[in-house]
Amino acid sequence: MEKNVLEFLENSQRMYGEKTACADMNNELTYTQLMNQAKFIGSCLSLKIKPTQGVPVYMDKTCNTLSLFMGIVYAGGYYCMLDTTHPAERINLILDTIQADILVVDNKSAKKAEKLGFQGEIINLDELLEEYHGQAVDSEAQERLGKIREQALDTDPLYSIFTSGSTGVPKGVIVNHRSTIDFIDCFTETFGITNEDVIGNQAPFDFDVSVKDIYSSLKTGATLQLIPKMCFSFPTKLLDFLDDRKVTTIIWAVSALCIVTTLNGFEYKRPSSLNKIMFSGEVMPIKHLNAWRVQYPDAMFVNLYGPTEITCNCTYYIIDREFGLDEKLPMGKPFANERVFLLDDEDKLVDAGRPGELGEICVSGTAVTMGYLRNPEKTAAAFVQNPLNDRYLETIYRTGDLGYYSEDGELFFSSRKDFQIKHMGHRI
């Protein structure tokens, strides 16, 4: 059993070393190149950070960003991707929360980063990689990385993603290796993702949908294609990209799928390799779902549900029939090793025997994350002892979403308790 996500990378490198692991518009890395580059970055960063320390990453996503993430993990730290388009005020709130000693940028983001007023050391990834010529790390660095790995636990943090929540103040969800490994094992097995797949990444790396793209690829030896953001403004470019790169699997925000059908993209082209189409973040309009299913009658369509705080998703529904325009998609069933249930206002269980009654959607299992970074008050409010269990410690996550069971026992999403809305899958 894996205890560190680096085992995903190293296992795939052993089996598929010369296969493309990740590609963007300007670059691609094989599994061997990705691993070696990550080890080089890790050997450099291990001199600058302590184990379990957070490293903020301030750049656009590229193949090198992925090698940086893995390099941070080799150094024993956890990564936190920052959106370079966000206001400096928000970025600085996040940097203050992480209490970072270093900030990693690239040539494109370096000048913008200087204006943040960051007090620690700014490291330019592009400049760092100029010193790297594909060589293996030296024996001293190898020994240093080995010691870090020996001391690592599967409960060590892997990444942090900041959500705004209902207050607009960023909350940093902190997710460990165990939660990620357990979820990705279930996810790839449930949907049959293999080394033959090509995953088309839509989600920004500061959004947890990207976790499924990244680690499903690393786990199985699939190829990860990073789709430029610009493509989602021009469906013809998007469809060309999917077709040219032979993308088989997309795990997108609902709104990204709807862009294609709203602008009649399929009148231009139908990418021929797609066979797994998954979506989350918002309620999927049946009209748009049906338009996609007409184009891909043999593909697997999956409705996914779950907030960042439970490691990506906790339920899934494989669509196996035609839905009418007046119908809603069910949430489906929990992933293996996760329990999903409803609690009423008095913390009593709302089960399928009480159809139509609203309850707060709650989740337990190893996918429940470590809470909010340096925010004990918010953590204590949402990550709580299971009120149905008075026998031993069992932490559950209260999602703040309301759900209900239908007459035939299907679980449905109703609404937020606090009236948040979503944009491109982000809670705002």
What is each residue range found by the language model?
Residues 4-6, 88-90, 103-116, 120-150, ...:
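AMP-dependent adenylate-forming
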Residues 34, 67, 71-79, 93, ...:
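A generic "structured core" feature
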Residues 27, 59-63, 77-93, 107-110, ...:
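ATP-dependent adenylate-forming carboxylate-activation enzymes
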Residues 1-160, 175-176, 182, 285-290, ...:
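AMP-binding/adenylate-forming domain of the ANL superfamily
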Residues 9-11, 63-81, 187-188, 210-222, ...:
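Hydrophobic alpha-helical segments in the ANL/AMP-binding
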Residues 59-62, 83, 193, 203-207, ...:
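Conserved AMP-binding
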Residues 219-222, 247-251, 261-330, 336-339:
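Gly/Ser/Thr-rich phosphate-binding loop
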Residues 171-200, 208-248:
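Conserved AMP-binding/adenylation subdomain of ANL enzymes
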